[in-house]
Amino acid sequence: MGCLLILLLTLICFSLRLCLATDVITFSSEFRDSETVVSNHSTFRFGFFSPVNSTGRYAGIWFNNIPVQTVVWVANSNSPINDSSGMVSISKEGNLVVMDGRGQVHWSTNVLVPVAANTFYARLLNTGNLVLLGTTNTGDEILWESFEHPQNIYLPTMSLATDTKTGRSLKLRSWKSPFDPSPGRYSAGLIPLPFPELVVWKDDLLMWRSGPWNGQYFIGLPNMDYRINLFELTLSSDNRGSVSMSYAGNTLLYHFLLDSEGSVFQRDWNVAIQEWKTWLKVPSTKCDTYATCGQFASCRFNPGSTPPCMCIRGFKPQSYAEWNNGNWTQGCVRKAPLQCESRDNNDGSRKSDGFVRVQKMKVPHNPQRSGANEQDCPESCLKNCSCTAYSFDRGIGCLLWSGNLMDMQEFSGTGVVFYIRLADSEFKKRTNRSIVITVTLLVGAFLFAGTVVLALWKIAKHREKNRNTRLLNERMEALSSNDVGAILVNQYKLKELPLFEFQVLAVATNNFSITNKLGQGGFGAVYKGRLQEGLDIAVKRLSRTSGQGVEEFVNEVVVISKLQHRNLVRLLGFCIEGEERMLVYEFMPENCLDAYLFDPVKQRLLDWKTRFNIIDGICRGLMYLHRDSRLKIIHRDLKASNILLDENLNPKISDFGLARIFQGNEDEVSTVRVVGTYGYMAPEYAMGGLFSEKSDVFSLGVILLEIVSGRRNSSFYNDGQNPNLSAYAWKLWNTGEDIALVDPVIFEECFENEIRRCVHVGLLCVQDHANDRPSVATVIWMLSSENSNLPEPKQPAFIPRRGTSEVESSGQSDPRASINNVSLTKITGR
């Protein structure tokens, strides 16, 4: 009798615990159409809904706190309920079911279970995963989960997977239309062999492919390393037919969406403008569609230019008539057969085939793996008569292609270097033409004796160029001798970035015309340019008298080349020619933040929502540098003039010449010479040369106060009572007049609490002691958590003014407080 009583009490307590939980469905606690279940952290909600322009009722999961209803999973997608009589419950067999008022089952988890039905319950997890659990003697066991049945949205911690041995396949499936969640014609998933690759199908027809996975990103999509890094994507493969992929976003709102038209979107929620923001869309152009140009042809998308398809060198259209009519699907054929295929070359005297090099490519479909190293990769292709091309990727190794080359695309930005096999005769034609040109030039040279003097002068310049190149190599070797420098040189090779010729950049910038000049910094001028293919660029031309040496130049190149994030400016390449040193960036059409923020006219274009979005973007870019990138980066020169704005006024952190990389066991670095900009430097850095993550947080706090107030920090230079903006904000805070700090342009009562919170967080960031300042991750949480209680700020650091010989900088936002120089650093352990 006692044992029976204990068992009864146990069941009562278990049932009571589940009934009190709002994220649980039990055998006795079903919910009806008007009711919902909410996950523990209120991120997701499970209930009934009707799509736009539809009267059918579906049981589904959606984001809970997003005003735009965004459904991530639907139970009865194939069988809507025609009225509001629906209910979700645990059946007597132990399955989670969706039924209508007549008891007809419209959907079921449909699992076979060996235990009693009253020990089953369903729970909506904080990840958006709906799970069916059974309680046994050993604890709760997951019997079914919605993440194992993905639909059109791919959430953090979900997996896409394919196993050819077991037949298991987890892939996205589009809705039939935006108003009909039943399965559509498009799906997206992974193919495991010969290399893991992300693909989109229309029915069974391949529509788009990402290119092979190289261990860090998919190499067939421009900027995929930048996009995917936002999500900490991981992919595992056994190279025998099994592959799986998952990712982790900064928040659970990040996701991928496969829409009913077959496009994959990467989205996250923009709090400032209250809408979904799209960061990536594939396919996005006609060239992205699989095999648009057919075999042996490359597609290059340029708005307004036709045709997008071009036969690669050594090939011609298979049908000129079809090609000229815009039908490129037949592709191209060789002009001359390969030597190993020629029937006229069996005497052993034939010349070997060669390779033509093409850059910035999406590699063709269906590569094969070779065990050859980088030096032997070309020979391994030449030894195989069926091999038509090769490429080498450091993450994959040697890649070989046989037969027709399909789905090639030329990018304007990043891409793979690719080598296509051609007959020796194709190179002879070029050689003959070169001989004619050379003879003509020599004859002309004899007619102009004065060119001898010019040639001698060029020889002298060439020696000077060699000296500078040798100096660069010596600096690279010196950089490698440092532990941190070795990481830079080994992991981020300069040769992996495009090397621009000086003449190309001179033409692009109209010979560095004053009309193309965007601005002037301490290290040189920045010019707008346009490359021949139509891509707008920004060229930072370092002054010959600049304080930025080779080490800083190399530092900026190697640091920013692989640190790619939507809130960091992207480096496209560089130029080293003679004494010229230039950096080529993506062009930011709206210039820098201070050009808007401190201009009486332009600042009116920055309303509060826009300014908050800028604050959020700066924080997320800094979060990536400090925590989410493969190496911890301290910027050291964060200021409004180093925040660039794109066409939508989204911020991008720039100018990494003074940035420093921390290894895994360091959290603080000591320097013998302080570099940066007065007013943005933390006190421990300005006074003692110590810098860390919290030094950047201090700079972030100053920028935050500048954005809220619309006033430059240095505008208090002649103010005897307030040495800087932080001191002024602190005085207003203590007197309860902090709202007086706010720029009148942005103040509206509906935003007052949010603006006050930003002032509060800004003061927390500029506190005197580094340990008192929050991390960037905490700053992001503080800014987005409306109901959280923030700690009271302590007095900011009021740094005494110093002369320019003591405080040095990479820019010239205030000529009284910044000049340029080189920083020597030493590492300090924890």
From Swiss-Prot:
Glycosylation sites: 40, 53, 82, 327, 384, 432
Keyword Lipid biosynthesis: no
Compartments it resides in: Cell membrane
Post-translational modification Phosphothreonine, affected residues: 545, 671, 825, 828
Residue ranges, annotated region (CaM-binding): 601-618
InterPro entries attached to this UniProt entry: Bulb-type_lectin_dom, Bulb-type_lectin_dom_sf, Kinase-like_dom_sf, Pan_app, Prot_kinase_dom, Protein_kinase_ATP_BS, S-locus_recpt_kinase_C, S_locus_glycoprot_dom
Catalytic activity: L-seryl-[protein] + ATP = O-phospho-L-seryl-[protein] + ADP + H(+); L-threonyl-[protein] + ATP = O-phospho-L-threonyl-[protein] + ADP + H(+)
Keywords associated with the record: ATP-binding, Calmodulin-binding, Cell membrane, Disulfide bond, EGF-like domain, Glycoprotein, Kinase, Lectin, Membrane, Nucleotide-binding, Phosphoprotein, Plant defense, Receptor, Serine/threonine-protein kinase, Signal, Transferase, Transmembrane, Transmembrane helix
Induction remarks: By P.syringae and salicylic acid (SA).
Domain Protein kinase, chain residue ranges per copy: 512-798
Segments of skewed composition (Polar residues): 806-830
Annotated EGF-like domain residues: 283-321
Tissues where the protein occurs: Mostly expressed in rosette leaves, and, to a lower extent, in cauline leaves and stems.
Function recorded in the entry: Receptor-like serine/threonine-protein kinase that represses the disease resistance signaling pathway triggered in response to bacterial pathogen such as Pseudomonas syringae pv. tomato.
Subunit structure: Interacts with PUB9, PUB13 and PUB14. Binds to calmodulin (CaM) in a Ca(2+)-dependent manner.
Name of the protein in question: G-type lectin S-receptor-like serine/threonine-protein kinase SD1-13
Organism: Arabidopsis thaliana (Mouse-ear cress)
Gene assigned in the entry: SD113
